[in-house]
Structure formats: structure tokens, C-alpha cells
Amino acid sequence: MKWLKRDCALQPVCPEGLALSFEVPDWNEIYDGCIELANQIKKSGFNPEIIVGVARGGWIPARILSDLLGNTYVASMKVEFYKDVAETAKKPVISQQVSTAVEGKRVLVVDDVADTGESLTTVRRNLLGRGASQVKIATLHYKPQSILRPDF
């Protein structure tokens, strides 16, 4: 998937003087990425019982994937890691636990990007610790420096 490159200096969220470039998908690219993910998930044979959207970037893709996979059971979970643009805390902290019981369930975790992979690793560990039978990760974008490679 090719996303548009944006200059952070032009964005209102960018701290003054920070030279940073990032990619921003449009709605069609997000939807097309979700179709690609749904096809990969179906082809793999993985059939999630619960889809967990990681707040906030994973909410929209999780909702779209729920339609594409025919799974209406969507939950949410929030992890705090970024303090500001390009500035992280020492470690991710789960600030909102998953909004449903996952014990014995196959769970698909959805986020927009696997950046460092720290947040997604924390989410996977937490869900397995809560008794999920299987946890798979799907992201629209994957950065090579991520410590976690998404399943989809």
C-alpha cells in the first residue's frame, strides 16, 4: 500500500521546529488495506471470535474488518505509549482494558501501524494473560524496525 507522504511541519500536531515526514492514508487506501487484510486472514484459515481495535488508530480498520470477515463482535482496548509526535514513554501502559471477556477465545487485534511494536506486544501479552486461546495481530502498515511483525 502506498500512502501519501506528508511534511510534519505543515501539520498542526507537529511541535514547532521538528523536521519529520510521515505517511497519511486517505479513506480509500484504508478501505483497500482492510480488504487486503481480510483476504489474508480468510486465506490463513484464522477465524477470530472477537476483533479488538486498539484505540485509537485501530478502531476504524477493526470496524471495517468486522464487516469484511462477517464478525460483528468488536471490542476496544487502549494503550498509551506516545507522549507527543515521535516521543514515546519508557514502556506502553494499558489505560483501558479490553472491553469484553476473551478467555478461551480466538482474538484478532487490529491497529493502524506496527511502529515500534511495543504497544502491540503489550496488548498480545495482556490478552494471552487474560486467557485468550489465540491472539493474532493485523495492521495496515508495518515499519521494518518494529520488534513485532504482524500476522497480517
Task: For the regions a language model picked out, list residue spans one by one.
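PRPP-associated nucleotide enzymes
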Residues: M1-F152
